[in-house]
Amino acid sequence: MALTKFEYNSFDVTPVASNGFAFNSTPNGLTTASAGAMTLIKTQTASDVASVEFKHGTSDVVLDGTYDTYLFKFIGMHPETDATDMTVNFSVDTGSNYNVSKMTTFFRTQLYENNTSGVVAYIAGNDLTEGTGEQYLNQDGSMGADNDQCLAGYMYLFNPSSTTYVKHFMSTTIEVNAGDRCRQAFVAGYGNTTSAIDAVRFKCSSGNINGTIKLYGVTK
C-alpha cells in the first residue's frame, strides 16, 4: 500500500480555528464540525483519592464560554467505603470554596437481583432547596464497594460561564449498589448563582473514590 506524506503546513485550520473541525476531502482537508460534536477536554483517573476536581485553567481544563454545554462521563466509579454516595458540588472561585446554592429534584428506579422490589420513587431526602452542600448523584447510602460493584453515568452542565442566568445541570447514574440492587438515579436542578461556575468537584460522601471521569465540551 502506497503512503502519502503530508507536510504540517498543508493543513490550513485558519478558516475554522474558532470552531470544532473535522477532516474532509477538500484541498485544505478540514471542515467545521456540526453543532453537537463533542471534544474531549480532560480525562482523570482516580485511585483511592478524596475527590476529583475540574478547575478552569488548571491542568488543561476548559470550563468557560468556549462551550455552552459540558458533559462529564463517570466510568467504573468504585468507593473505598461501602454504602456511601457519589456527590457533586460547584465553585465560583476556581475551587477555593465549593458552596454554590442549589435547587434540585431527585428520583430513582430500582430492582433487586432476586427480581423483587421493582419501583420508581421520588426521594425527597436527596433533593436540595437552596442547599450549599453536596448534591447526591445516587440514592443516599447505597453505593457498593464489593469487587463487582460500581457506578457509571453522566452529568450535563449548561452555560457555566453565564453571568446573567442560573446554571442548570442534570445527571443520570446507574449502579450495582450495596444491597445488590440495580438502581438508576435521575437528578436535575440548577446552581442558583449568576456568577460564573469555574470548577466542579466529585467525591464520595464517606471515604475515597476510584474510577475515571471524562470532561467533554459540546460544540455550539
Segment roles from a protein language model:
Residues 2-220:
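Surface-exposed molecular-recognition determinants
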